[in-house]
Amino acid sequence: MKKVFVVGQQKWYSEWIEDHVIADNLEEADIVMFTGGEDVDPSLYGCEKHPTTYSNIARDLEEKAVFEKVRSDQLCVGVCRGSQFLCVMNGGLLIQNVSNHATFGTHQIIRADRDSERYEITSTHHQMQYPFNLRKNVDYRVLYYASRRSEFYEGVVAPPSCEPEIVLYTVADKPVCLAIQGHPEMMRAEAPVIAMLNNLIDQLC
């Protein structure tokens, strides 16, 4: 039984994880979950704020303090804003404005090493992870991506080579963060993407 500590106590974000209980504190958790909400403040990744960015620096700093206490035997999982936050904490940047992703419906994500494997997942975001050329000693792997849905990529110098949807961050080949851009908590329990994500988490922790 996995113990999940939901940062900020928005416990419904973890409901899609099978066979889990809510941890009351960080120390006892197997999984530390960072959830959705406001945009991450660009000051955390050294950029100027785009006019469309709405951030809460107090929340960012509180969650940064939690992230810095996470042990090497714990897995961080980020959902939507949480995925972007984990990108930043691992030295990445954010694309501050994209189109055709804040649909409040679903869109398709594609497995990076097997493009015949595709899933539908709920999408509500206007920002996006930019894990390319990480500034820290962290490696990343884009596990799933979206086919260039956006008409523009505002807030970065170069467009992304793909639109990252699920990114795994590792340190010395050890998984440390699983960043999920979509909203699995908004999907039906029987949706294929839920089984895929649970299988992935089982492999990582």
Question: Model-derived features: where do they sit?
Answer:
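Catalytic nucleophile loop
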Residues: 83
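N-terminal beta1-alpha1 cap of cysteine-dependent amidohydrolase-like domains
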Residues: 1-79, 88-95, 99-126, 130-173, ...
